[in-house]
Swiss-Prot record:
GO terms for cellular component: cytosol. Responsible for synthesis of pseudouridine from uracil-13 in transfer RNAs. The keyword tRNA processing applies. The gene is truD. This is tRNA pseudouridine synthase D. GO terms for molecular function: RNA binding; tRNA pseudouridine(13) synthase activity. The lineage of its organism: Bacteria, Pseudomonadati, Pseudomonadota, Gammaproteobacteria, Pseudomonadales. CDD domains: PseudoU_synth_EcTruD. PANTHER family: TRNA PSEUDOURIDINE SYNTHASE D. The active site is at residue 81.
């Protein structure tokens, strides 16, 4: 499956050129934002960890081994990219135990930067946002055009697609999810089950968002929409008055799309008709998600880009800094500006 099939059309026009992202880990830096004051005491040891070219699950296993505890005793708020330099929190459950020596877990790919005790473990999804610093190298695009596009994105946001990372190489996770859905069965391994359910659900959401981008309604509230604030999981229906709410214009309030699961969508009017039409394309997948116990939830269609700044350290390097809500993808911001190519493709005359 192509990127266009997995995500959908761009909202800002054609890409302005090409660039490389993640030539080295330092080109893609992520800092987890966690608004939880830590008490300094308790049976949970919280760790602020820097990882380089290491995924979250492997880091958790290494920390658990070094601490001498089962991997189920370690928690984290969210998964971070492997091919990146990331800093995120973990927590170890150590009732009645002293702080362990974690040096055995450390090497060039993992460093424990800070450790603090707290009364509670770190919950999944507890982080409020992620801060990104991206360096796009081998940039082949006009700076003035890039500046204008980024200013447009700062003011209008971008479609809140799930990035291709969610779907595996070539959309393999989606293919696998569709296969399991057709068999009306679930993988026994919990991590595989979670990955495929997430991929299937995200794929359906992207299909809905792609249709809203195509008809220009992704950033505009319609009667029957369900609206939500950027950092809220609650939502409310839109009537004529709500569609004129000034908070829509300043990117505080957004239309939402369905995260398919058990129960009918509370949307109405034209948005409900579109959601039903998208679901009708993949009835087995929708039923599979519901039978797996997934709840019907909502996700904002428009992604505001917090604190967006940029500069050019070199003529062919664009550095971006911004903050996104938890669960949102930095690469969907970049794709609205340039096409990303692998480092080995940048010398091809056909790229630009």
């Amino acid at each position: 499956m192509t990127e266009l099939e997995l995500l959908g059309p761009r909202a800002s026009g054609e890409p302005l050129g090409t660039a490389v992202l993640k030539a080295v880990a330092e080109d893609f830096q992520v800092d987890e934002v966690l608004d939880i004051p830590l008490s300094g005491q308790g049976e949970h040891l919280w760790l602020w960890v820097e990882k380089r070219d290491l995924n979250t699950e492997e880091a958790a296993r290494r920390l658990a081994r070094a601490a001498g505890v089962p991997v189920r005793s370690i928690s984290y708020a969210g998964l971070k990219d492997r091919q990146a330099l990331t800093r995120q929190w973990f927590s170890l459950h150590l009732p009645g135990k002293a702080d362990p020596d974690l040096s055995r877990a450390e090497d060039a790919s993992l460093r424990v930067l800070k450790q603090v005790r707290h009364q509670r473990k770190l919950q999944r999804g507890a982080h409020s946002a992620n801060g990104f610093t991206l360096r796009l190298t081998a940039l082949a695009a006009d700076h003035q055009a890039v500046d204008a596009r980024l200013e447009q994105l700062r003011q209008q946001g971008v479609p809140n697609y799930f990035g291709t990372q969610r779907f595996g190489h070539g959309g393999g996770n989606v293919h696998d999810a569709l296969d399991w859905a057709a068999r009306k069965a679930l993988p026994e391994q919990r991590n595989v089950r979670s990955r495929l359910l997430s991929a299937g659900r995200s794929y359906l959401f992207n299909q809905l968002l792609a249709a809203r981008v195509a008809d220009g309604s992704w950033a505009r509230a319609q009667v029957g929409d369900l609206l939500a604030f950027t950092d809220s999981r609650s939502f409310f229906p839109a009537g004529e008055a709500e569609c004129a709410d000034p908070r829509l214009a300043i990117l505080d309030l957004h239309p939402t799309g369905p995260m398919w699961g058990e129960g009918a969508s509370p949307a109405g009017a034209a948005p409900a008709q579109l959601e039903n039409a998208i679901g009708a394309r993949q009835p087995a997948l929708c039923q599979w998600l519901a039978q797996a116990g997934m709840d019907h939830e909502r996700r904002i269609l428009r992604l505001p880009i917090g604190g967006l700044t940029w500069h050019y350290p070199e003529p062919d390097i664009l550095q971006l800094e911004f903050v996104l809500p938890a669960g949102c993808f930095a690469t969907v911001v970049v794709r609205e500006v340039v096409d990303l190519v692998s480092a080995g493709q940048t010398d091809s005359p056909c790229v630009f």
